[in-house]
Regions:
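Juxtamembrane regions of bacterial inner-membrane/periplasmic proteins
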Residues: 2-297, 309, 313-315, 320, ...
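Soluble, non-transmembrane domains of envelope/secretory-pathway proteins that act on or interact
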Residues: 11-14, 484-490, 529-785
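Residue-level preference for non-acidic, small/hydrophobic
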Residues: 49, 78, 121, 155, ...
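Short pre-catalytic segments that frame enzyme active sites
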Residues: 50-64, 174, 203-207, 259-267, ...
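Surface-exposed patches in mature extracellular/periplasmic domains of secreted proteins
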Residues: 86-95, 110, 133-134, 156, ...
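Conserved catalytic neighborhood of penicillin-recognizing serine enzymes
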Residues: 106-131, 185, 248-264, 358-413, ...
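Glycine-rich, acidic and aromatic/proline-enriched surface loops and short helix-turn segments
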Residues: 123, 127, 161-168, 185, ...
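A penicillin-recognizing enzyme superfamily signal
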Residues: 273-294, 304-308, 317, 324-336, ...
Length: 785
């Protein structure tokens, strides 16, 4: 019935109906979808809600993003002060507007607006247009539309986020921090009342100015709250005693470089981060302490990143030390690519274990090495001859690492680094060559900590599920509290390395007595059980340290952001002390559980660390299951001895029935030369029995020049340069490689033409030449310049 009458009315009054529809449509669309298009400050908070830092909005205003809610005290104060009928009207208050009209007419100017909080939101939206009756009419229309769209609490939220609070402070949240150093929900009644009266006259807040006027307005509001029985008398009297803010608080700068990162990725947003305020401030203190120490050596920049392994959340993010602009304080070193030094060595060790190329204790050569003109050196410029792979990693020896990479291949290792998502390893493998393992590449602290967190997470998940891996174990690190990392489903296949290989790598990295002879280990706390590694780039430009246990990864970089190197800047002396100080502020963690399902017990040669043969003294060891692909011991050989076992013999000089066959651990000549000096229990091959060596040594190799006890006088050429003496040796197999020594100094090796130039100071020397079978000849000479 009603619809029929309405239809008849529409047909009779088409013009009125059309105008009405147009007005309704205009009214409906009178407010834009986004009411405020202002730029907001980028804000970061700790996981506890503590303000860590903020970056001012593009228009120069401290305007925080809108909050989800308005605290009770401020809500009560602002309603009592500005619009006590707020919850009763529908956008405007006719009575207040009428009283305002009378006052303005009497004063012959605008002295009172009579606006509700809803109208004030509209006025803020319209950027405070000049006051007029027409403008007031527009505000009323839009205010009613606003009430249709939003709830009362949402309207209060808009007001609290956009109201001016003096100077360039906009919004309750920023005002709360700026004037009281508190979050809005932490405000007292007096503080909330102070902020409630400010938007009415924002110029009142200036340090040392207008304090009495502001105090009077605040106290009147507090009295009203007491009279309205919102607060009791005791609360009212105590609130009156609270002083006004005098000096504005500075915006905290607790994580300035994470703020930079957030501003790039979440500009104009308020991000609740995963940072722990306690740990962030403690790490800041540690960095400041070491910065004050290191700057005396003109080392100005330090970065520390701490990751929770279980969640991959960032716990602490210190992108640089508290230096100045002259020393690049704004550079976020956590994201900056830097030379790796030795920090990638554990990845090579894990890769070779996982492929079965080595076992943890496999001997790796540590001898003078030259490969296509590339001559790596150990940090201490010494050689051990041969070192177990795990000790080579623990001591960060360079020569064994290069030889391991040569065996594994640069291309394969490059692929592994790509699998680890080290973004700065981005040139062709051939551009790196063998230097890839010694600092020829670059990485950053973020990617490095991500890789080590992946390793720890792999072992943790495998041991907790007995034999499973997560497909997204190498998940990116996360600093957003409202986001969680998705590790994907569990599967049987590994991502990059098996858990057993990673666990064995951590076992090697757990060693504490490295590098040998270094006096910097007084800071080391042996009760902190972590796997860790240091690295130092060429020229002392970068000092790295990374540590990992079941729960945390800590990464440290020390150096100059400009790339300037400094003497004494090393990973072990500069970065490692910071690493351990940071670990001390976290709870102690148990060591990784052993992933027995990815290990097997096999017989290992006691001497060489390779799979034992029937000629080796063996012992049972837990190794990765891939060990079955590893090499058998290449160093044990059967030799023939006489009955006393003091001399070697052969069939030309000893009856077969009198020979004793024994197994002997024999290293190649150069390896043996250095190994026996470091290992006093190493037994060299016994000498040949008299009458046997002529059939062996002298038939195979002898000196051509010089003869025994020759006195050699070094001469000079026409340019005044000393001419070397050429030592010559003949060998029955010209393709045999010979290794030359002058006393204990290794000179090099020769093939085909066995000639070695020598220049030395005046004195008596022993020349030693050893072939590939370990047969050696010696000659004493005297040199005179």
């Amino acid at each position: 019935m009603f619809l029929n009458r309405l239809w008849q009315y529409i047909k009779r009054n088409k013009i009125k109906t059309t105008i009405g529809i147009i007005l309704v449509v205009v009214y409906y669309f009178s407010l834009p979808k986004v009411l405020f298009k202002n730029d907001y400050a980028t804000v970061i908070e700790s996981k506890e809600g503590q303000l860590l830092g903020a970056k001012i909005a593009y228009d120069g205003q401290w305007r925080f993003p809108e909050s989800d809610s308005v605290p009770h005290k401020f809500k009560t104060c602002i309603v009592a002060f500005e619009d006590q009928h707020f919850y009763k009207h529908f956008g405007f208050n006719p009575i207040s507007m009428y009283h305002a009209f009378l006052q303005n007419r009497k004063a012959n100017k605008v002295v009172r607006g009579g606006s509700t909080l809803t109208q004030q939101v509209i006025r803020l939206h319209r950027e405070n247009q000049k006051r007029s009756y027409f403008e007031k009419f527009i505000e009323v229309i839009l205010a009613t539309r606003l009430e249709f769209r939003y709830s009362k609490d949402e309207i209060l939220g808009l007001y609290a986020a956009h109201a001016p609070f003096g100077s360039n402070v906009v919004g309750l949240e920023m005002a709360s921090w700026r004037y009281f150093g508190l979050q809005p929900h932490q405000l007292s009644w007096a503080e909330a009342a102070t902020l409630a009266v400010l938007p009415n006259a924002p110029s009142l807040i200036y340090p040392g100015k207008n304090q009495q006027r502001l105090l009077d307005k605040r106290n009147r509001l507090l009295k009203k709250l007491w009279q309205d029985k919102i607060i009791d008398k005791e609360t009212y009297e105590l609130a009156l005693l609270e002083s006004l803010p005098k000096k504005p608080f500075d915006v905290p700068q607790i994580a300035p470089h994470l703020l930079q990162k957030t501003a790039k990725e979440h500009k104009g947003e308020k991000i609740k981060t995963t940072l722990s305020i306690y740990h962030q401030e403690r790490v800041n203190d540690i960095v400041k302490q070491y910065y004050n120490l290191y700057k005396q050596n003109e080392v100005y920049n330090i970065a520390v990143l701490v990751v929770d392994v279980k969640t991959r959340n960032i716990i602490s993010y210190v992108g640089n030390s508290p230096t100045d602009k002259n020393h690049q304080k704004d550079v976020d070193v956590i994201e900056a690519p830097r030379s790796t030094g030795s920090i990638l060595k554990p990845f090579l060790y894990a890769s070779m274990l996982d492929d079965g190329d080595i076992l943890p204790e496999s001997l790796i050569p540590d001898i003078p090495t030259q490969i296509s003109g590339y001559s790596p050196q150990n940090y201490n410029h010494t050689y051990d001859g041969a070192v177990p792979a795990n000790r080579a990693l623990a001591r960060s020896l360079n020569i064994p690492a290069v030889l391991m990479l040569q065996e594994y291949s640069v291309n394969k290792f490059y692929e592994q680094l790509q699998n680890l998502k080290l973004r700065n390893v981005n040139r062709q493998p051939s551009n790196y060559g063998l230097s890839l393992i010694l600092g020829g590449a670059e990485t950053n602290l973020w990617d490095l900590c991500r890789a080590y967190a992946f390793m720890s997470g792999t072992v943790n998940h495998f041991t907790s599920t007995q034999d499973e891996y997560r497909i997204n174990e190498l998940a990116n690190l996360n600093y957003n509290f409202n986001e969680t990392v998705d590790f994907g489903k569990s599967v049987q296949n590994k991502n990059i390395w098996n858990a057993g290989a990673i666990w064995q790598t951590f076992e090697a990295m757990k060693e504490v007595n490295r590098p040998e002879g270094d006096e910097a280990w007084q800071f080391y706390d042996s009760s902190i059980e972590i796997a860790w590694k240091t690295g130092t780039s060429f020229g002392g430009r970068d000092a790295w340290a990374v540590g990992v246990n079941k729960d945390y990864v800590v990464g440290v970089w020390v150096g100059n952001a400009t790339g300037e190197g400094r003497p004494l800047l090393t990973g072990v002396e500069s970065a490692a002390p910071i690493l351990f100080d940071v670990f001390r502020i976290f709870p102690r963690s148990k060591w990784f559980e052993t992933p027995y399902n990815d290990l097997e017990e096999v017989t290992i040669c006691k001497n060489s660390g390779f799979l034992a043969t029937n000629t080796c003294p063996g012992e049972l060891k837990w190794v990765p299951k891939t060990a079955k692909k590893s090499k058998n011991c290449p160093y044990h050989k059967l030799i023939h001895l006489d009955q006393t076992k003091q001399y070697r013999v052969n069939s030309s000089c000893e009856a077969i029935e009198n020979m004793v066959t024994d197994s002997w651990f024999v290293l190649p000549p150069v390896m043996e030369w250095y190994y026996k000096k470091k290992n006093i229990d190493y037994k060299q091959l016994p000498p040949f029995k008299e009458g046997c060596e002529n059939n062996d040594v002298r038939k195979k190799m002898d000196f051509i020049y010089p003869t025994s006890f020759t006195k050699i006088i070094l001469t000079k050429n026409f340019e005044g340069n000393t001419q070397p003496v050429i030592i010559k040796v003949a060998h029955s197999n010209s393709e045999e490689e010979l290794f030359w020594y002058l006393d204990d100094k290794y000179l090099g090796s020769t093939k085909t033409f066995h000639e070695m130039p020598i220049i030395a100071n005046s004195g008596i020397y022993i020349i030693t030449v050893i072939d590939e079978e370990g047969i050696e000849i010696k000659r004493k000479i005297e040199i005179e310049k």
